[in-house]
Design a protein with these regions (language model features):
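Extended, low-polarity segments enriched in aliphatic/aromatic residues
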Residues: 1-231
Length: 231
């Protein structure tokens, strides 16, 4: 949320599709380097969750959270389901920041577009994906028995989050340039391809230089989080 700062910063989104700006903690504009550190896992709305999807944590619950009513609240800690997944309510920002082009109820459309709008506004300098010990078939503890613990024993890092996430997807056994609404993006759009088309990085493995042990040696087959939205 706002933290020690007296106000929020407004960060514009170049060529924003669902968001024209983000109202966020001032740390994100005062910092010299932005590192996205996340776990290697699949995701029901985004297909995979890597350095890009990790940016979903930037918009503060105090303005975007589900536990808000009519006014911003610095005590809020809720998810952003209504504003950024369902698109059935606007955030309580000081200026209008959303375009209104989200599709109500369609996580698979809204989440990928918001991921790219976040990536366009907050340029990641280093993406680190922890696949040493992680989970698959679900996003987190809140999914209960759907979660499967797994130990790929991998650490994936890169200077561009689109490229890094593409390598992560390939290591997981997925095609990072797969068509929309196919594995692993079965419930929606391929946000890696959306990011490439916005000029944010490359998601086609043939165009990437990969160091370390290489994709084939590192491959650890994942099960996609295939639960249909609403099921």
């Amino acid at each position: 949320n706002r933290g020690v700062y007296g106000d929020y910063a407004i960060v514009k989104v170049p060529e924003g599709q669902l968001a024209t700006a983000w109202e966020v903690n001032r740390t994100y504009v005062d910092t010299d380097v932005l590192v996205s550190l996340t776990k290697l896992k699949s995701h029901v709305s985004a297909g995979i969750s890597g350095g890009l999807k990790n940016l979903f944590g930037i918009p503060p619950s105090s303005l975007y959270g589900d536990d808000l009513k009519d006014n911003p609240d610095e005590r809020a800690v809720g998810y952003r389901n209504g504003t950024m997944h369902e698109c059935n309510r606007a955030p309580l920002t000081s200026v209008r920041t959303f375009t209104g082009k989200g599709v109500p109820g369609d996580h698979g459309y809204n989440v990928p577009h918001f991921i790219v709008d976040l990536a366009a506004a907050f340029r990641v300098d280093l993406a680190v994906i922890d696949g040493i010990s992680t989970i698959q078939t679900a996003e987190g503890w809140w999914n209960g028995s759907m979660v499967s613990l797994t130990r790929p024993g991998l650490l994936i890092a890169g200077r561009n989050p689109v490229c890094t996430d593409a390598v992560a997807a390939a290591v997981m056994g997925f095609d990072p340039d797969a068509a929309d609404r196919t594995w692993p993006f079965v419930n929606g759009l391929n946000h890696l391809a959306l990011a490439r088309r916005r000029g944010l990085g490359e998601n086609r493995i043939k165009n990437l230089e990969v160091g370390g042990v290489g994709i084939e040696a590192a491959r650890f087959e994942y099960q996609p989080t295939f639960r249909r939205i609403g099921a």
